[in-house]
């Protein structure tokens, strides 16, 4: 029939449609079981109304573009309705699953610990902060600005902790004892130190060009000295505390720099001169120097006695940290042996456990500066011994970091109380931060002079060397935690000022640094002539 939407090709001469159907559905009884014999049926040609050409069924299945516009709209509406069908599908199902998992985590912990997991308890506060910080990081990462690198999720985590602390209704319910928060931050610090130690490439270390060496050490040292002098005169810090603050500020953040550099590298900007690789490689060594300097000053600041005793104490802590790191590193080099099962898992457990033990043990034995050095040296030596196998261990450590990162930045934000901050303190901390940043940018520019870079490239490198985040969050509160352990009120005030500067540094430089890199990179760096750029490994 011409009015029919479908027409069936005849099975053969003299057979009508009913006969073809009978042949197709012919039933045969065999051993009492009825089976159906199928004959090959000619393909069905689909005809559409309004004079449209027939649609091939393969194209109909594989492409929505072949459908008439009205059919596409109906399909989209059906897909949206299906998301709320029973049982739920898609995003609706994902939301229900995630909420259920969060509630179950709390319910399981509550069933074991009781009141500690109710509002006002430590475990309730930790879980609330963890989920809030993770949600804040997710929301920040959803902000997409075309042609710009994404905002670092750590910014949302930091702000989530800050809001929890400074909204009275929430603050009364989310309470975390300072000993619990200090312990969690120290665990996060141990994980960061392990990642930094494993991330050091001995081959790159041997082949470091002069410009990479200068960029790793020059800005960090000069900024630390600048912050020490400025804080000594305008904030009243002792020089040891000033240098401690300086080394907190002196580290650049791989969490901001590396993703931004990878985006530029993928698009071919600065690749011919190796600028993304230079910044990613120098970042690790810059962080190691800052952490080492901080731990040395930490030991000197909390030692009692004369200046000579303080210096000797600082040197002793460095020696003890390096010696313990060498011992643990050689142990991990040979144990577990390569013939054991689950080798990667055992290595990951041992290096994490030893690093946490080193950080907490150094505090217990009165050598607070030794734990960080021990962990760095141990992880570096273990990475050399494991060679290419260390990549799997790094992946496992990264999972631990994914858990503790929201806790770390959330706890740092939760330490800052607007009510307890004095305007003059914020002003002095901001002034110290700005002066140190200006000096760092200038020194970074000088460090890459006479290295074959153009003026625009030098300016870009100096600006890209500005962001602060991960290291500041990890070590910014260590001095405050140590002072609280010793119950020294004067040192607690110094420690809170150090933490405030670290908080402001993250809040200001992390988003601005990411935006500056994304905006200035395409304008100041030369684009590679080759359209295909091979991504080089990140640090």
UniProtKB/Swiss-Prot annotation:
Cell compartments where the protein resides: Cell membrane; Mitochondrion membrane; Endosome membrane; Recycling endosome membrane
Record-listed Na(+) binding positions: 252, 283, 286-287
Top-level taxon in the UniProt lineage: Eukaryota
Keyword field contains Protease: no
Keywords recorded for this protein, A-Z: Antiport, Cell membrane, Cytoplasmic vesicle, Endosome, Hydrogen ion transport, Ion transport, Membrane, Metal-binding, Mitochondrion, Sodium, Sodium transport, Synapse, Transmembrane, Transmembrane helix, Transport
Regulation: Allosterically inhibited by the N-terminal domain. Inhibited by phloretin.
Sequence similarity: Belongs to the monovalent cation:proton antiporter 1 (CPA1) transporter (TC 2.A.36) family.
Subunit structure: Homodimer; dimerization is essential for SLC9B2 activity. Lipids seem to play a role in the stabilization of the dimerization subdomain.
PANTHER family: CATION_H+ EXCHANGER DOMAIN-CONTAINING PROTEIN, PTHR31102
Entry function: Electroneutral Na(+) Li(+)/H(+) antiporter that extrudes Na(+) or Li(+) in exchange for external protons across the membrane. Uses the proton gradient/membrane potential to extrude sodium. Contributes to the regulation of intracellular pH and sodium homeostasis. Also able to mediate Na(+)/Li(+) antiporter activity in kidney.
Stated name of the protein: Sodium/hydrogen exchanger 9B2
Gene: slc9b2
């Amino acid at each position: 029939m011409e009015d029919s939407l479908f027409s069936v090709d005849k099975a053969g001469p003299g057979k009508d449609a009913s006969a073809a159907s009978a042949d197709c559905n012919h039933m045969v009884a065999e051993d009492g079981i009825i089976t159906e014999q199928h004959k090959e049926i000619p393909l069905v040609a689909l005809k559409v109304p309004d004079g449209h050409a027939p649609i091939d069924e393969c194209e109909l299945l594989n492409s929505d573009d072949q459908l008439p516009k009205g059919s596409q709209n109906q399909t989209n509406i059906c897909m949206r309705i299906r998301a709320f069908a029973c049982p739920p599908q898609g995003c609706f199902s994902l939301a229900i699953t995630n909420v259920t998992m969060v509630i179950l985590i709390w319910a399981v912990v509550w069933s074991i610990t009781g009141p500690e997991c109710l509002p006002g308890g430590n475990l309730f506060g930790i879980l609330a902060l963890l989920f809030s910080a993770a949600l804040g990081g997710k929301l920040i990462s959803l902000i997409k600005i075309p042609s710009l690198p994404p905002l670092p999720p750590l910014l949302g985590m930091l702000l989530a902790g800050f809001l929890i602390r400074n909204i009275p209704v929430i603050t009364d319910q989310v309470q975390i004892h300072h000993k619990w928060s200090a312990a969690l931050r120290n665990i996060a610090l141990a994980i960061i130190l392990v990642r930094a130690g494993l991330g050091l490439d001995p081959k790159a270390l041997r082949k470091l060009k002069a410009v990479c060496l200068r960029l790793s050490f020059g800005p960090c040292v000069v900024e630390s000295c600048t912050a020490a002098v400025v804080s000594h005169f305008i904030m009243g810090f002792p020089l040891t505390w000033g240098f401690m603050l300086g080394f907190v500020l002196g580290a650049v953040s791989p969490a901001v720099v590396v993703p931004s550099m990878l985006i530029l590298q993928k698009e071919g900007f600065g690749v011919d001169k190796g600028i993304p690789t230079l910044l990613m490689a120098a970042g690790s060594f810059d962080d190691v120097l800052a952490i080492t300097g901080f731990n040395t000053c930490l030991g000197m600041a909390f030692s009692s006695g004369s200046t000579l005793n303080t210096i000797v104490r600082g040197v002793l802590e460095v020696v003890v940290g390096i010696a313990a790191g060498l011992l643990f590193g050689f142990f991990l080099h040979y144990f577990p042996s390569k013939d054991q099962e689950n080798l990667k898992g055992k290595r990951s457990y041992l290096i994490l456990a030893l690093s946490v033990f080193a950080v907490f043990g150094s505090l217990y034995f009165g050598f607070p500066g030794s734990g960080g050095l021990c962990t760095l040296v141990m992880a570096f030596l273990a990475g050399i011994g494991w060679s290419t196998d260390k990549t799997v261990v790094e992946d496992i450590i990264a999972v631990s970091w994914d858990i503790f990162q929201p806790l770390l930045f959330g706890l740092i934000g939760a330490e800052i109380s607007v009510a307890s901050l004095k305007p003059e303190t914020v002003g002095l901390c901001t002034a110290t931060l700005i002066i140190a940043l200006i000096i760092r940018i200038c020194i970074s520019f000088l460090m890459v002079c006479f290295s074959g870079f153009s003026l625009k490239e030098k300016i870009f490198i100096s600006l890209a060397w500005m962001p602060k985040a991960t290291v500041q969050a990890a070590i910014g509160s260590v001095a405050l935690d140590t002072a609280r352990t010793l119950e020294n009120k004067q040192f607690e005030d110094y420690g809170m000022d150090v933490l405030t500067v670290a908080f402001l540094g993250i809040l200001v430089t992390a988003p601005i640094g990411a935006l500056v890199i994304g905006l200035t990179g395409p304008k100041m760096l030369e684009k590679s002539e080759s359209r295909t750029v091979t991504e080089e490994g990140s640090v």
